[in-house]
Amino acid sequence: RSQHGFPGGRAGPPLPSPGPAGLPGHRSSSGALTPVSRPARGRPAGPSPAPTPRPSADGDQCASNPCRNGGSCEDQLGSYICFCPDSFQGRNCETNKKDLLVCVNENGGCEQYCSDHAEGGRSCRCHEGYTLQDDGVSCAPTVEYPCGKIPVLEKRNGSNPQGRIVGGRVCPKGECPWQAILTVDGALLCGGTLLDAAWVVSAAHCFKTRKNWRNLTVVLGEHDLREQEGEEQERRVARVFIPDKYVPGKTNHDIALLQLNRPVTFTDHVVPLCLPEKSFSERTLASVRFSTVSGWGQLLHRGATAVQLMAIDVPRVMTQDCQEQSRRWEGSPTVTENMFCAGYLDGSKDACQGDSGGPHATKFQGTWYLTGIVSWGEGCAAEDHFGVYTRVSRYIEWLRRLMNTNTTLRGLLRAPLP
């Protein structure tokens, strides 16, 4: 410690050594200490007078009443501190905390959906199957199997383990309950995501040949492809919708909506993933760094298909960074505004062929939402390449409109984009 008692201060000259009586002393020529007793210089011996307060040289920093909205001021050396009422904050208590309650700021504190009001403030809302609680921000389920929840974890009060497919891990049975598998004549075609009891979303490029939808089967509740585990529900497909602007062989608008011939039954192992509101997806979910991708795709490039459902956490990548990376490789498709990138450049973890159409699921405040569809990439976990996903937020209106449309047409149908 310094001579002023502050740690880290610059040391002053050494203090004189104490003599036998604890008083300052001097060293004689023989080296022995000789006590010295004399009054302090410049002051007569006797009791010390009380120190006279020295007027502050910098003046009263609170004299100008800098604290607003009822804040109280405390003068400091060359500065001041405002103590604000509960509803205000800021250096001068200038900010009403209610003004910070806007959706762009931490989702307005809402657990699910947030709406700003023109007159100021915001209100929270909940997805279908949930209801807003008395606190005005929390959402509680109103149905046995609400979307975006994982019953096998909820019932054991667990938390979804952080999975890290190529370089991935097995998704434990029931922990990816919205995962669908699309098969043609029993062979794996693509992955998919359950959005509602009769609706599954996948990738348009899975249906490049007529055969792929004529003999198409969708299975929910699947985990191990080698075994019948009793949780599987198999359905035929009545119709497949793809965007009218999708061009076969191209990568833009790579999304397909499948209507099952009859609804599945929700169980602990079959639960839909929430299709989020567009603004919530673009403003809030897009800022979540890691999301989970799952599927039975090849474990290695041109390798064997996984027999158990795999899952992997991938970080979202800035679109500009992905576009720059893609331009370095001749022949790579253009990354458009209808796509986003995620993954690692070191080739360690990626979605792979056979995972096409599967979910890119994002968790926010305990509920999972569909944010992407596995679309394309350069090989599997190829170095210097990210995985590319269909940006679901661009198609939410299209999906909702189709899910609310009744049609007797069957087969592969082109549906106009809004």
Model-derived segments and their meaning:
Residues 58, 152, 156-166, 179-185, ...:
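Extracellular trypsin-like serine protease catalytic domains
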Residues 200-203, 208-245, 269, 273, ...:
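Conserved H-D interstitial segment of serine endopeptidase catalytic domains
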Residues 61-69, 103-111, 327:
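Disulfide-braced loops of extracellular cysteine-rich modules
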Residues 1-56:
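Extracellular mucin-like/proteoglycan-style low-complexity regions
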Residues 184-197, 250:
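A conserved glycine-rich beta-strand in the N-terminal activation segment of trypsin-fold
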Residues 70-72, 111-113, 192:
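Small-residue (G/S/T/A) turn/hinge positions that recur once per unit in extracellular repeat modules
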Residues 248-272, 284-295:
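Serine endopeptidase catalytic core focused on the charge-relay Asp
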